Regions:
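Exported/periplasmic ABC-transporter solute-binding proteins
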Residues: 1-4, 9-14, 22-23, 27-31, ...
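Phosphate-/polyanion-interacting regions in eukaryotic proteins
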Residues: 19
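Acyl-donor-binding surface of acyltransferase catalytic domains
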Residues: 34
Length: 214
């Protein structure tokens, strides 16, 4: 099946909604006239993923500056969690160059034998930690919650605010003017505003959006 075709028939590929963890993306689309309604519907925050039982005794984000840790982090090229937030956290602590070697790459050793940059951190970091290839990794809190629900051999270490970027990380969503299912798109956004949807997000580790945001 070719992209844009089903059984040889052309299909419209214009989506009805667009979502991003970077609100600037939606503001840009609004400015270009492609989107007229958008909102932040939930929040996330950074957390450290460690091996179950935390054998390295990692207690805080500043411990990423320790010399005895092997780290696994999202790459700064294609993974927004690090490109926009994780790297900023390391810079706030003054350890960005030490942890990353100032490298911009993926599926690579940023610092040989010390810091690995993933291609898909949500899959690779838990596995590397379980396999003993890494001691710690920057992830979303929701990823720690999900991994533990799945019985993975990992734990989470909370990162104190404001380093965890909880006031900056908002999942935004909006309806696109060229979408063919406008009514359904607006109904879906209304659902995301409901207490039921907010409770579901919270059960996975998200922080509810404020009434002003939704």
């Amino acid at each position: 099946m070719k992209q844009g075709e089903i059984e040889g028939q052309k299909t419209a590929m214009n989506p009805d909604i667009f979502a991003s963890v970077n609100l600037k993306h939606l503001k840009k689309m609004n400015k270009k006239g492609k989107m007229d309604q958008y909102m932040i519907y939930t929040h996330n925050k950074l957390e450290l993923m460690v091996k179950k039982g935390n054998p390295k005794g990692i207690k805080k984000a500043e411990d990423l500056g320790r010399d005895d840790l092997v780290q696994s982090h999202p790459n700064p090229k294609t993974e927004g969690i690090f490109k926009f937030y994780g790297s900023e956290m390391l810079k706030d602590m003054g350890i960005y160059s030490k942890v990353t070697g100032d490298k911009i790459c993926k599926s690579c050793w940023a610092v040989e034998g010390k810091t690995w940059f993933t291609s898909r951190h949500h899959r690779e970091t838990p596995q590397r930690i379980e396999d003993g290839q890494a001691d710690v990794g920057i992830v979303w809190k929701t990823e720690v919650v999900h991994a533990k629900k799945e019985g993975r051999g990992v734990d989470g270490v909370a990162i104190a605010a404001p380093l965890n970027k909880q006031d900056n990380v908002g999942y935004a969503i909006g309806t696109l003017k060229e979408g063919r299912n406008q009514a359904n798109a607006h109904t879906f956004l209304q659902y995301l505003q409901s207490d039921g949807a907010q409770d579901i997000d919270a059960s996975y580790g998200c922080r509810n959006a404020s009434k002003a945001e939704v």
